[in-house]
Amino acid sequence: DKALKISKDLRNAYEQDEETHYLIDMSKRLEGLPRHASMHAAGVVIGKTAIDEYVPLATGADNAAVTQFTMTTIEELGLLKMDFLGLRTLTVIQDAEKMVRRKVPDFDITKIDPTDKEVYEMIGNGHTEGVFQLESSGMKSFMKELKPQNMEDIIAGISLYRPGPMDFIPRYIEGKNHQESIHYECEQMEEILEPTYGCIVYQEQVMQIVMKLAGYTLGRSDLVRRAMSKKKGDVMIKERQNFVYGNEEEGIPGCINNGIDEKTANQIWDEMLDFAKYAFNKSHAAAYAVVAYRTAYLRCHYPVEFMAALLT
């Protein structure tokens, strides 16, 4: 329709030539229809009983059973969609662990000390060749600057070292090194942002803010998290009102009713919007940080076994 309005020649052909008219009419009917069916790379649908009791199934690649609905429809129906991704690094860790046990029979990678100073010192010095997520030249430089001292620092580092959040790295490091300079808009914000030195790094922090400050439920806060990460403008306009002023019909008290003034509430919302565009899922980052730390531990204390497993 837009092309017909813009192009006079096309409009004339559409009006005067029967074949052109037919082709354009058919194109309008086809426009927007799914081109083909495909299967999610890692998504697995979980239900209480057999999935075909809830949704129609089809046969996908390699004879796998797939739903005929999209993942958004699946979630709207109340089914659980989980992403299960394979990670070769886990095989490296397993192989290294087997080799270490030849000389330390009771060695268990799941029982290593998560506060080992030697490991953090090695990471902070940038000696991270082979360490999961931390071995690129850019990440090495970041780790030298960050000087991680605990698992929280590694989790934050993995979350921040991505396009977008990287802009907030200087602020994060400044807050870590000079905690007295951090300003919190209210007491509740300090409680939530203290682990990340005043920066909103995780999606879970967005959820905590709307729950603690404005009285959102856990379910409603998750909807806000999704809307912010997907930049749904219309939803955000409505939720700003709910966040600041509350919504009695929907059971949201709002910031003002919780003792936070209008100006401060709006400032917090603006800050959330700014950070939430890039905020990372903490549970994902934490899982990656555990794998990173385990590879770092092996590299630090059992370099021969680790490198042999890595190169095999």
Protein language model features and the residues they cover:
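Noncatalytic, beta-rich nucleic-acid-contacting surfaces in large DNA/RNA-processing enzymes
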Residues: 1-312
